[in-house]
UniProtKB/Swiss-Prot annotation:
It comes from Homo sapiens. Interacts with TNNI3, ACTC1, ACTA1, MYBPC3, AIP, FABP3 and HADHB. It comes from the Eukaryota. Changing G526D: In CCDD; pathogenic; the mutation results in decreased protein solubility; causes abnormal aggregation; markedly reduced protein expression is observed in the sarcoplasm and nuclei of patient cardiomyocytes; severely reduced autophosphorylation. This is Serine/threonine-protein kinase TNNI3K. Belongs to the protein kinase superfamily. TKL Ser/Thr protein kinase family. MAP kinase kinase kinase subfamily. Gene3D superfamilies: Ankyrin repeat-containing domain, Transferase(Phosphotransferase) domain 1.
Length: 835
């Protein structure tokens, strides 16, 4: 039994074939080198071979730097058969080799000049003479795929089964390079289809490995009949090779019943063709083998204690393949090989975190242990999959296993309660994980320095730091000055935590920011990249602060027009991000990351959690990005694959927050709020005061199904319509936090610097707003019920007469409607009272 951890990724046959391939590449390079003649010399030679008079005066002892005689040059520079005869009659030997190891016949064949080939052969050239690499002229014709040259040689008696230095016949070479017509010609002249190469490989092995179906069929014809079960020196049959390299059409052809292929045969490593298909992620091939040949191969273990299921977990990049194998109900997800390791061990050892998550979610037991077969029988070294991941430095997987909550557990595990018993002794980063992280970070920084335009490169000495205006896990944010601009400086700490480092976040954020240019997205000024201790990101300074601060710390009240301006700006910024050539998903859109200008316009900021959409599959998605309170359900629950529609959900919550002035689910902690939205389909209440067009937009925006959410282009269009028609909205359209009706201006505030410049500056106090709204409401009640005098009431009288919406302990006005249940996407527009 072999040790799984020492399983080679390449076999001896692979190494040999790599050298064979390299040798033929070198052969072609040497042939091409012989054909390279200086321009001046080439012109002179063409004149010699183009004129009988000039040819008669030529020096017969002439040689080039590469040792080419006139006989060689005649084959390269347009000579004629008469020149060949004359030169050979005057004593030039056709057997003479160039410094690269080729005769004139070799060069004539490589040039595919049938006339000169015939002339050389008629004049006495040896058709079997070997040159560099033990190659004959027929080998060279086959390498180049020259059908006419090969035909001439075979007509003149070339040995069709002669072997070169690596024991390849011309048929081997034709099968390797896929020269179908040459293969047909060689078979016509009696080429042996079952002759062995240096490592026992037949032409059918080579055609199967390279995927040449038509050549495989030619080799299997009645007149040829290659042995379909022939084994090389490592007991590979042709089916092993086409399965390994994913040549589905050849697999299907070989598995035909009349060919009598043995589909479950094993090589010296114990691998069936199904093993090799799974080790290389060839899903369609694996399906074909099982559907045609049955499930016998699924139960076979190789010498490394791996079934085909283990092999698929070792490959780890095709969850569909793993799922298909499990669906056959032959191998259990917790099947242990002879050494005790499971598919989960294999996935952990090779760092396939998505597969690890899938296996855990489907019942894989992380407590099962494997033994090291290299130890003596008296020693016991049992290891869980966590230890295998730790050994290889896959710290993200270690963290996942330590904290994974199994369905039967009430609480997730932690490092002191890890079921396998070794969690409390394992801390991350692991030694190897730390080295990997440091190496990757250095590579990332070097790539970032090389790729960042020079005008974005900043020195720390160029930056003047003023007061601190914010902080986070990454470090601190300062107000400052750089290149005569007031800027915000995000200063990173150069420390590493687990596999998620500040350096990693820094590189990602800079690589994204440097590509952004939009008025509704924070403007990038530059970055300091020289030393991890000096890492900093510099952006424009937005003086109005964050939307969160404005609404919930300063408790400022905006009118509806100001709210819509902010909402439109944010939507435009997000639309820009999602429609880039390389779309960007923000992943952390919330009111903290929406910054306001003094004129009331907004920009989207903070791209520390952002990703290029195409890179999501490569990222570790076990950590939920961003703030839980604004997180889309699919991000909170799955923590795996999601789309740009996750940003739309977060935006819908921000829009509700802008309109109501309240924190979403303020009475809950962030995790509880996210859980309520994800598992109970709860959404913030939509009061009667929110305009209907916006209400419908909110309902669609926080749809439980991502596909049911609108694109940001539609959001922008709808909100701009509301902004343009704002005066048509009734006074009741003001929100539950009591915003005043907009001013009389009906202009659409699309461009910065329009009529809305003073809106933020003209904010009212909450008391003034409540007074105005309730006075308006009281007037309406008086007119309809006749209960009050027309002379007006004092504020105290109005307070007693009207029922105020209660104000909670945080100072926020509670919406008169209770929280609502939001149903699944099949009925996305319906609500029901939570009571």
């Amino acid at each position: 039994m072999g040790n799984y951890k020492s399983r080679p990724t390449q076999t001896c046959t692979d190494e040999w074939k790599k050298k064979v391939s390299e040798s033929y590449v070198i052969t072609i390079e040497r042939l091409e080198d012989d054909l390279q003649i200086k321009e001046k010399e080439l012109t002179e030679l063409r004149n010699i071979f183009g004129s009988d008079e000039a040819f008669s005066k030529v020096n017969l002892n002439y040689r080039t730097e590469n040792g080419l005689s006139l006989l060689h040059l005649c084959c390269i520079c347009g000579g004629k058969k008469s020149h060949i005869r004359t030169l050979m009659l005057k004593g030039l030997r056709p057997s003479r080799l160039t410094r690269n190891g080729f005769t004139a016949l070799h060069l004539a064949v490589y040039k595919d000049n049938a006339e000169l080939i015939t002339s050389l052969l008629h004049s006495g050239a040896d058709i079997q003479q070997v040159g560099y690499g033990g190659l004959t002229a027929l080998h060279i014709a086959t390498i180049a795929g020259h059908l006419e040259a090969a035909d001439v040689l075979l007509q003149h008696g070339a040995n069709v089964n002669i072997q070169d230095a690596v024991f390849f016949t011309p048929l081997h070479i034709a099968a390797y390079y896929g020269h179908e017509q040459v293969t047909r010609l060689l078979l016509k002249f009696g080429a042996d289809v079952n002759v062995s190469g240096e490592v026992g490989d037949r032409p059918l092995h080579l055609a199967s490995a390279k995927g040449f179906l038509n050549i495989a069929k030619l080799l299997m014809e009645e007149g040829s009949k290659a042995d379909v079960n022939a084994q090389d020196n490592e007991d590979h049959v042709p089916l092993h090779f086409c399965s390994r390299f994913g040549h589905h059409d050849i697999v299907k052809y070989l598995l035909q019943s009349d060919l009598e292929v043995q589909p479950h045969v094993v090589n010296i490593y114990g691998d069936t063709p199904l093993h090799l298909a799974c080790y290389n992620g060839k899903f369609e091939v694996a399906k074909e083998i099982i559907q045609i040949s049955g499930t016998e191969s699924l139960t076979k273990e190789n010498i490394f204690s791996e079934t085909a299921f283990h092999s698929a977990c070792t490959y780890g990049k095709s969850i569909d393949l793993v799922k298909f194998l499990l669906d056959q109900n032959v191998i259990n997800i917790n099947h242990q090989g002879r050494d005790g390791h499971t598919g989960l061990h294999s996935a952990c050892y090779h760092g396939h975190i998505r597969l690890v998550q899938f296996l855990l979610d489907n019942g894989a037991d992380m407590n099962l242990v494997a033994c090291d077969p290299s130890r003596s029988s008296g020693e016991k070294d049992e290891q869980t999959c966590l230890m295998w991941a730790y050994e290889k430095g896959h710290d993200a997987i270690v963290t996942l296993l330590k904290h994974y909550k199994r369905p039967q557990d009430e609480l997730p595990c932690n490092e002191y309660s890890q079921p396998g018993g070794d969690g409390s002794y394992v801390s991350v980063p692991s030694p190897l994980g730390k080295i990997k992280s440091m190496t990757k970070e250095k590579a990332d920084i070097l790539l970032l320095r090389a790729g960042l335009p020079s005008h974005f490169h900043l020195q720390l000495s160029e930056i003047e730091f003023h007061e601190i205006i914010g902080s986070g896990s990454f470090g601190k944010v300062y107000k400052g000055r750089c290149r005569n601009k007031i800027v915000a400086i995000k200063r990173y700490r150069a420390n590493t935590y687990c596999s998620k480092s500040d350096v990693d976040m820094f590189c990602r954020e800079v690589s994204i920011l440097c590509q952004l240019n939009h008025p509704c997205v924070i403007q990038f000024v530059g970055a300091c990249l020289n030393d991890p201790s000096q890492f900093a990101i510099v952006t424009q300074y937005i003086s109005g602060g964050s939307l969160f601060s404005l609404l919930h710390e300063q408790k400022r009240i905006l009118d509806l027009q100001s709210k819509l301006i902010i909402a439109v700006d944010v939507a435009k910024g997000m639309e820009y991000l999602h429609n880039l050539t390389q779309p960007i998903i923000h992943r952390d859109l919330n009111s903290h990351n929406i910054l306001l200008y003094e004129d009331g316009h907004a920009v989207v900021a903070d791209f520390g959690e952002s990703r290029f959409l195409q890179s999501l599959d490569e990222d570790n998605m076990t950590k939920q990005p961003g703030n839980l309170r604004w997180m889309a359900p699919e991000v909170f629950t799955q923590c795996t694959r999601y789309t740009i529609k996750a940003d739309v959900f977060s935006y819908a919550l921000c829009l509700w927050e802008i309109l109501t002035g309240e924190i979403p689910f303020a009475h809950l902690k962030p995790a509880a709020a996210a859980a309520d939205m994800a598992y109970h389909h709860i959404r913030p209440p939509i009061g009667y005061s929110i305009p209907k067009p916006i209400s419908s937009l909110l309902i669609r925006g926080w749809n439980a199904c991502p596909e049911g959410r609108p694109e940001f282009s539609e959001v922008v269009m709808k909100l701009e319509e509301c902004l343009c028609n704002i005066e048509l909205m009734s006074p009741a359209s003001s929100n539950s936090s009591g915003s005043l009706s907009p001013s009389s201006s009906s202009d659409c505030l699309v461009n910065r610097g329009g009529p809305g410049r003073s809106h933020v500056a003209a904010l009212r106090s909450r008391f003034e707003l409540e007074y105005a709204l309730n006075a308006r409401s009281y007037a309406a009640l008086s007119q309809s019920a006749g209960q009050y005098s027309s002379q007006g009431l004092s504020l105290e009288e109005m307070k007693r007469s009207l029922q105020y919406t209660p104000i909670d302990k945080y100072g926020y006005v509670s919406d008169p409607m209770s929280s609502m249940h939001f149903h699944s996407c099949r009925n996305s527009s319906s609500f029901e009272d939570s009571s």
